[in-house]
């Protein structure tokens, strides 16, 4: 039987599949070889042959499609014939997206099958996503259209919105109509020949997506809009079968596995489209995506096994490979957002591998937990610019079923000029040790230590300067050197920059970067803040001591030790210490009446007087007699402030001061002190009798 030839043309580029005659049952053998790559995982994503007649089949997982297979070729003569008849009138829903004129090519889940053939079908899942290609940058230009199938050959029809199929036998049409965004899975195949091309996407055991939606608005690169829901993270692997040597070169692009609804991939590569000759691949070759660096893969730009990202609408994620492009500005109203991540295609690890040996599927999640993003789930805006300085590279090992896949993500927090790498994973302790020993790391620690020292002395120096610190060399030496610039830490995540700035009296601003970032500890900062108030009082007290010594400089009677003994709080407890002898040093003679009342209320009423019997026995009494002295020389009673009259009882204390007898008795009952000289009024000690 003469073989049929199927051609899929895309403008100037064409993808040719040429198959020879097949009379054996080699299709089954080839699919068995393919299943050896990961039988356990493929059986979760493939449906049985008995279920292949359904036009719109649901996947095994809820709203998840884990496998896409496409096969072209001639029907084998040994296949079953009872399953092909249901595909002659197979229909599908196409989604047409408005906007952007004729510069967008819409590729929805398109199913093309030549009519008039009775080939048995295999399980093929054509869940192609909606793809938009900018005409001004992309070398491949296309109009809105669908695939036309004319007999044995298929090609892309540019101008139309209808899907036509003209077969040799019966003719069937698949109409394209606008539908809602509800995504439906389409299962089908054209033949069971194993010489056709297909893409096999497998889901890792430990991979999962956190539901969320993203909006991608780059100037160039990869633009993604829609919702990502329960798709695999990281890279995907595809199996490329044999192609004839005569097949032309065709661009190999990575198709990201996703079970989202209406995911839009806009590819605007600024460089030339790299091609890969299919003849260089052998049967069963495992291609690790991305193959060419110019192909921007969705899955390699999203973090593989990094964190569960909750991407909310209105946030941007930009991928760019053009180093000369303008950075994307952060929209207003996003002041609470974190600094952006920058993802580019510059640091990319990929290639081809002929090894299909099984490897472990467990993902090294511990490597990704030590990154600068805290927590397992993080709501983070992702604004990226195409230009970055130095990249903080952290490799995450991704092991997919029976294929070793490595991904190197390039992450950088925005900064001014210098990019500081975040703490690496625990597996690279050697690299972290070398970073700690680097001159840059040591310089940062030295600068922060200097800032801590200056913050402790900043307020002290300022107060000393305001309070005549120039007169005292001791206080002048405590002040930091006068300089117009000071180093102030600026917050910026792992890319914290050191800038020259006027030194602030309030001290430097430290941004707490987390436990993993080396910085000034909080106890030290609290000590610096508490020392400001204490240092102000200390400076004031020291100024008073020095002023007292200066005033007494001529007499040379007062020493520094004497002053410090009188006010020892300067040397010991400072402002927070309790001086229990403070009340004894009060100058009550120079206090006002209001101050004395306040002092009395604070001290309280303490009875230190004597009883009436002691007063009667100890108080000397006499009658007042006027003398020849002038009335101006006579003093009134100090207690009642009344003048003495002739014959009044007078009481005399041991100090010799006289008062009205009744007045001094009441006084002594309260306080056994002389109201005038403050000495002991009555001696209560028993006197020895003289024999």
From Swiss-Prot:
Residues 80-91, 361-370 have a biased composition (Basic and acidic residues). It catalyses: S-ubiquitinyl-[E2 ubiquitin-conjugating enzyme]-L-cysteine + [acceptor protein]-L-lysine = [E2 ubiquitin-conjugating enzyme]-L-cysteine + N(6)-ubiquitinyl-[acceptor protein]-L-lysine. InterPro entries: MBR1/2-like, Znf_RING, Znf_RING/FYVE/PHD. It comes from the Eukaryota. A zinc finger (RING-type) spans 637-678. Residues 71-91, 151-235, 316-336, 349-373, 395-501 are annotated as: Disordered. It holds the Pfam family zf-RING_2. GO terms for biological process: protein ubiquitination. Keywords: Metal-binding, Transferase, Ubl conjugation pathway, Zinc, Zinc-finger. GO terms for molecular function: ubiquitin protein ligase activity; zinc ion binding. It is an enzyme of class 2 (transferase). Probable E3 ubiquitin-protein ligase that may possess E3 ubiquitin ligase activity in vitro. This is Probable E3 ubiquitin-protein ligase RHG1A. It comes from Arabidopsis thaliana. The gene is RHG1A.
